[in-house]
Amino acid sequence: MDRAVSRVALENEEREAKNTWRFVFRIAILLLIVITLAISAAALVYSMEASTPGDLVGIPTVISRAEEKITSALSSNQDVVDRIYKQVALESPLALLNTESVIMNAITSLSYQINGAANNSGCGAPVHDPDYIGGIGKELIVDDASDVTSFYPSAFQEHLNFIPAPTTGSGCTRIPSFDISATHYCYTHNVILSGCRDHSHSHQYLALGVLRTSATGRVFFSTLRSINLDDNQNRKSCSVSATPLGCDMLCSKITETEEEDYSSVTPTSMVHGRLGFDGQYHEKDLDVITLFKDWVANYPGVGGGSFIDNRVWFPVYGGLKPNSPSDTVQEGRYVIYKRYNDTCPDEQDYQIRMAKSSYKPGRFGGKRVQQAILSIKVSTSLGEDPVLTIPPNTVTLMGAEGRVLTVGTSHFLYQRGSSYFSPALLYPMTVNNKTATLHSPYTFNAFTRPGSVPCQASARCPNSCVTGVYTDPYPLIFHRNHTLRGVFGTMLDDGQARLNPVSAVFDNISRSRITRVSSSRTKAAYTTSTCFKVVKTNKTYVLSIAEISNTLFGEFRIVPLLVEILKNDGV
């Protein structure tokens, strides 16, 4: 019994001893952990100089600055990426497309000639210097932001004069017509031996050439082929166009005054001619009895034509036969265009009555003077498949001289301000199936022409008159969406007299600083302007061909004025 009690007591003592040592061990371990943590914390504070909460206040600001630097760097990189994308995806393909277009035009021209070699059309198509590739017939200035009138013409530049001048006091050179394609240019004017008022006999000078760049970098026009048509055929009011087969020309043949022609009952004779690359000229009479069956007088617009969709398009105007189908369909039609910020004070009914009467001026016996466009297929056969388009007079004013232009993918018709509206007009033109459609025009309020009262330069109300002068605008500045912003032109800056020729860039309201040809009393007449670019130097030039008074040798001398387009970056 005692032995059993002793064993139990011994076991209890052993259990208590184990519990005591276990407790001591646990305390020791906890103390060791605490000491280790304390030493580690002290070491960390010492080695890292750990900040107190007060020291951490500026950290968000530092982080924000770092974020800004990173964002700025990323933005800068994005600008670089955008520029690379623009160059690779937009500009380079466009430049290649322009080059391809020029090459294809040249190949087309050569193809036409090769196919026509058997018909003696000639071979050896000329081509402008490579410096001009992509700089002819293009949208030369595309700018949405700059003020149009911050662009302006330089002083006139000396260059090679490619236009023959009169050689006697009674000689007269008048009515210049010019057109340029991607491969060559065409020029023509009328030559009268016995004064500018002689309507019975004249020559027609016609030339074909190319743009060159001299060794010193100067622009010049090089005539390669020319002919003086002196054959007792009195060609008048000629329009010229550069086509793949050479220089196509449309002329009327007349032996009477304009007033007498309007009094006749038959259409005016017309010819389609061509100066080939071989220097040979051929022409063919058009069947005007069929083509102009509703007309008593019909003339080319004197301004250049344009090669579009394998056809050449010429401006035409003249008098309609009273009560003919073409005349009847226009009866009651009219359009009124208004000056910028200068409205006509006349009653609306009176304005409408005067606008309707403006199409039938008394000078031409009350005949309706109509605008039109003639297109002819370009082939080795002249005068092939002619088609006449007569636009409605709800769009066009009284018929007048004009010009058909192509710039980029856009086509335009310029109409001389022979009626009451003085500011220059450019009608957008679309072509389809051999015919043309004209749309509401761009107007340039500061680009006026002189005229007789009540249709002087400042006129603002509809009236019946035949006045003005041919001074065409050339589309120069475009929006990126290809709509027109501004034009270049050489205008006669006088209210009533043909005086004071000045060149400028025009928007729809105002004009740039001007370049004056001479004094404000200098007499002048027709002007026609064409812009182009020397791609190598990225310089834009304008050839403005102007009739300037020349008292010693003939009444007028036709002068090819050349300017560079500059920009005032301060505007």
Swiss-Prot record:
Cellular compartments annotated: Virion membrane; Host cell membrane
Designated name of the protein: Hemagglutinin-neuraminidase
Reactions catalysed: Hydrolysis of alpha-(2->3)-, alpha-(2->6)-, alpha-(2->8)- glycosidic linkages of terminal sialic acid residues in oligosaccharides, glycoproteins, glycolipids, colominic acid and synthetic substrates
Keywords for this protein: Disulfide bond, Glycoprotein, Hemagglutinin, Host cell membrane, Host membrane, Host-virus interaction, Hydrolase, Membrane, Signal-anchor, Transmembrane, Transmembrane helix, Viral attachment to host cell, Viral envelope protein, Virion, Virus entry into host cell
Disulfide bonds: C172-C196, C186-C247, C238-C251, C344-C461, C455-C465
Glycosylated residues, chain numbering: N119, N341, N433, N481, N508, N538
EC number: 3.2.1.18
Region feature Involved in neuraminidase activity, mapped onto this chain: 234-239
Record's function text: Mediates the viral entry into the host cell together with fusion/F protein. Attaches the virus to sialic acid-containing cell receptors and thereby initiates infection. Binding of HN protein to the receptor induces a conformational change that allows the F protein to trigger virion/cell membranes fusion. Neuraminidase activity ensures the efficient spread of the virus by dissociating the mature virions from the neuraminic acid containing glycoproteins.
Residues in the Virion surface compartment per record: 48-571
A biological process term (GO) from this entry: symbiont entry into host cell
Domain of life where this protein originates: Viruses
Position of the signal peptide: none
Enzyme class per UniProt: hydrolase
Protein's membrane topology: Single-pass type II membrane protein
Keyword Membrane: yes
Any one GO cellular component localisation term in the record: host cell plasma membrane
TM ranges: 27-47
Residue ranges, annotated region (Important for interaction with fusion/F protein): 124-152
Subunit structure comment from the entry: Homotetramer; composed of disulfide-linked homodimers. Interacts with F protein trimer. Interacts with host CG-1B; this interaction inhibits viral adsorption and replication rather than internalization.
Domain notes: The C-terminus (head domain) is involved in binding the cellular receptor.
GO molecular function, one term: exo-alpha-sialidase activity
Family: Belongs to the paramyxoviruses hemagglutinin-neuraminidase family.
Organism: Newcastle disease virus (strain Her/33) (NDV)
A Pfam family per the record: HN
Gene symbol of the encoding locus: HN
